[in-house]
Protein backbone atom coordinates (compact mmCIF):
# COMPACT_ATOMS: atom_id res chain seq x y z
CA UNK A 1 0.00 0.00 0.00
CA UNK A 2 1.40 3.36 -0.94
CA UNK A 3 0.12 6.42 0.84
CA UNK A 4 -0.13 9.36 -1.56
CA UNK A 5 -2.54 11.72 0.16
CA UNK A 6 -2.33 15.15 -1.45
CA UNK A 7 -0.47 17.76 0.53
CA UNK A 8 1.61 15.38 2.61
CA UNK A 9 5.36 15.94 2.71
CA UNK A 10 6.10 12.21 2.58
CA UNK A 11 4.96 8.87 1.20
CA UNK A 12 4.89 5.55 3.03
CA UNK A 13 4.97 2.12 1.45
CA UNK A 14 3.73 -0.63 3.78
CA UNK A 15 4.54 -4.30 3.35
CA UNK A 16 3.56 -7.17 5.62
CA UNK A 17 6.22 -9.66 6.69
CA UNK A 18 5.46 -12.79 8.76
CA UNK A 19 6.43 -11.21 12.10
CA UNK A 20 6.33 -7.45 11.48
CA UNK A 21 5.04 -4.58 9.38
CA UNK A 22 7.61 -2.90 7.12
CA UNK A 23 7.21 0.84 6.45
CA UNK A 24 9.41 2.65 3.93
CA UNK A 25 9.20 6.43 4.28
CA UNK A 26 10.25 8.72 1.40
CA UNK A 27 10.55 12.50 1.72
CA UNK A 28 12.79 15.40 0.85
CA UNK A 29 11.68 17.40 3.92
CA UNK A 30 12.16 16.74 7.63
CA UNK A 31 11.29 18.21 10.99
CA UNK A 32 9.13 17.59 14.04
CA UNK A 33 5.76 17.89 12.29
CA UNK A 34 6.72 15.49 9.50
CA UNK A 35 8.33 13.01 11.91
CA UNK A 36 5.36 13.00 14.28
CA UNK A 37 2.87 12.71 11.42
CA UNK A 38 4.45 9.73 9.68
CA UNK A 39 5.27 7.95 12.95
CA UNK A 40 1.67 8.32 14.15
CA UNK A 41 0.48 6.99 10.80
CA UNK A 42 2.81 3.98 11.06
CA UNK A 43 1.69 3.21 14.63
CA UNK A 44 -1.96 3.44 13.52
CA UNK A 45 -1.27 1.07 10.64
CA UNK A 46 0.39 -1.42 13.02
CA UNK A 47 -2.71 -1.39 15.20
CA UNK A 48 -5.06 -1.65 12.23
CA UNK A 49 -3.18 -4.70 10.92
CA UNK A 50 -2.56 -6.19 14.40
CA UNK A 51 1.25 -5.99 14.29
CA UNK A 52 3.28 -5.65 17.50
CA UNK A 53 6.55 -5.11 15.61
CA UNK A 54 7.57 -2.69 12.89
CA UNK A 55 10.62 -2.07 10.74
CA UNK A 56 10.77 1.58 9.70
CA UNK A 57 13.18 2.42 6.89
CA UNK A 58 13.78 6.10 6.24
CA UNK A 59 14.75 7.41 2.83
CA UNK A 60 14.93 11.08 3.80
CA UNK A 61 17.95 13.07 2.66
CA UNK A 62 17.05 16.19 4.65
CA UNK A 63 18.36 16.58 8.19
CA UNK A 64 16.36 17.70 11.21
CA UNK A 65 17.51 19.33 14.44
CA UNK A 66 18.58 17.57 17.62
CA UNK A 67 15.67 19.35 19.33
CA UNK A 68 13.16 17.83 16.88
CA UNK A 69 14.67 14.37 17.38
CA UNK A 70 14.52 14.75 21.17
CA UNK A 71 10.92 15.95 21.10
CA UNK A 72 9.76 13.21 18.71
CA UNK A 73 11.61 10.42 20.52
CA UNK A 74 10.19 11.64 23.84
CA UNK A 75 6.68 11.49 22.42
CA UNK A 76 6.90 8.01 20.84
CA UNK A 77 4.70 6.45 23.57
CA UNK A 78 2.00 9.08 22.92
CA UNK A 79 2.37 8.58 19.15
CA UNK A 80 1.38 4.93 19.63
CA UNK A 81 4.66 3.05 20.12
CA UNK A 82 4.40 2.10 23.79
CA UNK A 83 3.60 -1.53 22.92
CA UNK A 84 5.18 -1.80 19.47
CA UNK A 85 8.73 -3.12 19.05
CA UNK A 86 10.57 -0.89 16.56
CA UNK A 87 13.56 -1.53 14.32
CA UNK A 88 14.82 1.61 12.56
CA UNK A 89 16.98 1.80 9.43
CA UNK A 90 18.14 5.06 7.85
CA UNK A 91 19.44 4.92 4.28
CA UNK A 92 21.65 7.93 5.03
CA UNK A 93 24.57 6.75 7.17
CA UNK A 94 25.59 10.34 7.97
CA UNK A 95 22.47 10.58 10.18
CA UNK A 96 23.60 7.67 12.40
CA UNK A 97 24.61 9.85 15.37
CA UNK A 98 21.26 11.67 15.35
CA UNK A 99 19.39 8.36 15.12
CA UNK A 100 21.37 6.87 18.01
CA UNK A 101 20.52 9.93 20.10
CA UNK A 102 16.83 9.42 19.30
CA UNK A 103 17.12 5.74 20.23
CA UNK A 104 18.64 6.62 23.61
CA UNK A 105 15.87 9.12 24.37
CA UNK A 106 13.12 6.70 23.29
CA UNK A 107 14.55 3.77 25.26
CA UNK A 108 14.73 6.01 28.34
CA UNK A 109 10.98 6.59 27.87
CA UNK A 110 10.26 2.85 27.77
CA UNK A 111 10.09 2.34 23.99
CA UNK A 112 11.59 -0.89 22.63
CA UNK A 113 13.52 0.52 19.66
CA UNK A 114 16.85 -0.30 18.05
CA UNK A 115 18.77 1.35 15.21
CA UNK A 116 20.26 -0.84 12.47
CA UNK A 117 22.54 -0.27 9.49
CA UNK A 118 20.56 -2.53 7.17
CA UNK A 119 17.14 -4.05 6.66
CA UNK A 120 18.72 -7.52 6.96
CA UNK A 121 20.07 -6.80 10.46
CA UNK A 122 16.74 -5.33 11.54
CA UNK A 123 14.83 -8.30 10.12
CA UNK A 124 17.03 -10.72 12.06
CA UNK A 125 16.43 -8.83 15.33
CA UNK A 126 12.67 -8.67 14.81
CA UNK A 127 12.44 -12.32 13.76
CA UNK A 128 14.46 -13.77 16.64
CA UNK A 129 12.00 -12.62 19.32
CA UNK A 130 8.76 -13.08 17.43
Protein language model regions, located:
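Amphipathic, Lys/Arg-enriched alpha-helical "gate/interface" segment within cytosolic domains
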Residues: 2-130
Amino acid sequence: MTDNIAGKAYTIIFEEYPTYLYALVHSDKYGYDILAQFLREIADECKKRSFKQVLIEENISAVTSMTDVFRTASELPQLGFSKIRMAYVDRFADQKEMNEFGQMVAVNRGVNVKIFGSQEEADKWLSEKA
